[in-house]
Amino acid sequence: IDITRLTLEAVKPFELGAKFGARCKNLWTLGLMFWLFGRERDTTTAWLKKKFGSKPNLAEANIAAMHAGHIYGETAELPNGIGIYQVPKASLEPGTYRNINGNEATAWGLVTGCKLAGIPLFYGSYPITPASSLLHNLAKLKHFGVTTFQAEDEIAAVCAAVGASFGGALGITGTSGPGVALKAEAIGLAISTELPLVVCDVQRGGPSTGLPTKTEQSDLFQAVWGRNGDAPLIVLAAATPGDCYYVAMEAVRLATKYMTPVVLLTDGYLANGAEPWKIPDVSSFKPFPVKFHTE
């Protein structure tokens, strides 16, 4: 589909010129997607009028491009098998909901888990896409007994977390695939010293430094086997942004129950994607108090 040409034809009456007219092609494509998935255009139309309230000509041009994309879907002879796909309405349990993304849910789950365990939370990390916002979110939660530490590199971050666990807190570190490789030796140290540690691996494209903004789910074997010697640990994976909350809590429970590192696998789509999340009743969660051996 020659989207640029069709967009320029749709916005020609608004005299935007080729450069600015071509910028409306995203709305043309959105109109086609609205047709494909059987969605209404009214909400987007209202939003465009509000967004470009001071420039009504731009608003109308974008709206015209969106309608043109929708009409193209209705009238074009598209390849066999391409047609309207109806997405059923989501079935939600009664309750209070809010939007949540995966990294936010992971941070809250870690805090909730440490509260149920009755131990302070220490989070040491080195900024790395797409895990950086874990540090941002946890830094806002210091009133829940959270300590955050931005280290100079990945190895320093995980070693600080291991030290925090040795001192009676729960050491947690967050990273992506390249960082997990650098942390392997220190994770092995936590395994051999039987210290709890949670490693949040927000996966991205690889190998090596890879592509920070591309998502992959390719770190499973690294998480399970990527250490020298006999160094087994627990590996968990979240399914949705909201699920990150509950899996993070479970990671805390398992790490403190068995005194071992736990790797929590998420990915860039989960970390940055959002979904309606039912706010849980935290009082219904069963505490799992932790006792460190001192002898």
Residue ranges of each PLM-predicted region?
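Conserved anion/nucleotide-ligand pocket segment
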Residues: 37, 242-245, 253-267
